[in-house]
Curated annotation (Swiss-Prot):
Keywords, comma-separated and alphabetical: Cell membrane, Membrane, Transmembrane, Transmembrane helix
One GO location term (cellular component): plasma membrane
Main location: membrane
Record's subcellular location: Cell membrane
Membrane topology: Multi-pass membrane protein
Pfam families listed in its UniProt record: DUF1516
Top-level taxonomy: Bacteria, Bacillati, Bacillota, Bacilli, Bacillales
Species in which this protein is naturally found: Bacillus cereus (strain ATCC 14579 / DSM 31 / CCUG 7414 / JCM 2152 / NBRC 15305 / NCIMB 9373 / NCTC 2599 / NRRL B-3711)
Protein name (database record): UPF0344 protein BC_1150
């Protein structure tokens, strides 16, 4: 399940940047955007399944940290969607980019720091 979740995130980020580049070039990115929305569903479902498997075995404050990681992941998805919708409507996206980047850094940090993630830190 972990590999499926990581693959879904990687594909989601790739589709996000492809859709962003299409919108910023003034072309239609609706099809890529819809594919990205499908990836959102897969990311949320696999993330929730991972969270539920962790709840069964985690001890101490691990529930809280994984809950915060899940919340930050949902903020990343919300930030991605808001950036693309505002881009398609030609509205400013500065604040939404800030939310997206801060949440993405938090998700990567927690993903690498917590026990299921890679042992970088």
């Amino acid at each position: 399940m972990v590999h499926m979740h990581i693959t879904a995130w990687a594909l989601g980020l790739i589709l996000f940047f492809v859709a962003y580049s299409l919108y910023s070039a003034g072309r239609k990115g609706k099809g890529v955007h819809m594919g990205l929305r499908l990836m959102y569903i897969i990311i949320i479902v696999t993330g929730f399944m991972l969270y539920m498997s962790i709840v069964k075995t985690a001890t101490g404050s691990m529930h809280m940290w994984y809950g915060l990681k899940m919340l930050a992941g949902i903020l990343v998805i919300g930030g991605m969607e808001m950036v693309l919708v505002k881009m398609s409507k030609n509205k400013p996206t500065g604040a939404v980019w800030g939310l997206f980047i801060v949440a993405l850094v938090a998700v990567f940090y927690l993903g690498l720091k917590l026990p299921i993630g890679w042992k970088v830190f």
